[in-house]
Amino acid sequence: MNIIFNACRYLCIALCLLLSSFLHSQMIDYQNLSLQQALEIGLKNNKNIQISHLKQEMSATKEKDLKMEKLPDIEFHTSYTQVTNLYQHQNGVFNKATKYDAINGMYDFTLSASIPVYMGGKIKNTEQKAAIDTEISALRTHLDERQLTMEIITAFLQIHHLKEQQSLINDKMKEDSVNIKQVKALKANGVVTVNEVLRTSLQLSNHKMSWTELDNDIQIAEHKLKTILSLPEDQEMHVNTEDLISDNAAIPYVDELTETALHKNESVEISHKNLSLKELDQKITKANYLPKITAGGEYFLKYPNMMFFPPEPYAYRLGMVGVNLTYPIESLYKNKYKMQEARENIDLAKLQIEENEEKIRHNVYEAYKKFEETDQKVKIAEESINQAKENYRIVRTKYANKLSLITELIDADNTYLEAESNLISVKINRQLKYYQLQYTIGNL
């Protein structure tokens, strides 16, 4: 009865877990996927992140395994041997041998144990190395997660840029349709020529072509994002890119950013931990000069009693406990260059720390200047769009009064469109540079 009850209980638990997983998947609106939802899905599904987490678990398992080295080795041994009688050639092998009856059956049951008492610090330092390797693995996992986050944000901003450009072209297409109607009306009244009708129609065709190209680019970008998120191929997905752009990004001084990066960037911490590993390697190599002490013992039951002579046909028991000391004399001459290599590895690790910190300082400075540059470009683009808008208004008024040609109106319209497109690009690029700066200093 209890077995049936337990089976039903486990079945209910499994169904509940399956249902909760199904409901969670239903809660995600893949037709209107937000950035936050995409980040959660990516950190959960992305294969590279899964590999990083698995490597981290493997490092932790290795660390636990090395701690077992301090425990005693226990071994049980048993054997049975059938022995013939002994023939001794007292007068040479070609003469008749003298026969001696031997105890024909031999067996033993042995239980032995040994434990390292002193190994020159090798076990302790190896454990510390494993612990540092686990910490490095965790740092690399966190770095991979940040890289994925930056990749997803970049994909969202790219899609947002394409959508904004498409929306701008869509507005221009509506405006083109209005212009065509007006020009056709003027043509009907004999005010303009057929050429002007064709030029306005050509403008609409060009904008339609641009809209189609942007639409395909959006689909490609969303498919790329779907690949990053490791979603099924048949899963339809569209992203919500609203509220991605902020004009209130406050950035502190570059010196403060550099200090933050030197404390938070994983590569800096990894390089310091790598130095610790090389120092531990030196200690492990130095341990080759030191003696090794182990303690152990064994207890056995054997037959026959070979401790006496002649052997007696009786089983006997015996226990032994002792300490074993070994000193590797060859290390006095074999370990010389290993120690030199260990010292050189430490010097190399120190140089790598300095090089890495210099690289971080430059990367922060570059990211900061690029953000400043986009900040200035936004102001310039805003001025340009005001000038282009005013120019378009003037030319349009002149064209309405037949004081300018259709080509001048189209040129002014294209200039205005280019200014609007450029403003969209620099604003989105400013947001991207802001995220890249945050990524460089380790905040993202």
Question: Where do the language-model regions lie?
Answer:
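Periplasmic alpha-helical coiled-coil/stalk elements that build and connect Gram-negative outer-membrane
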Residues: 2-3, 33, 37, 61-63, ...
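Sec/SRP-type N-terminal targeting helices
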Residues: 50-54, 67-68, 103, 117-145, ...
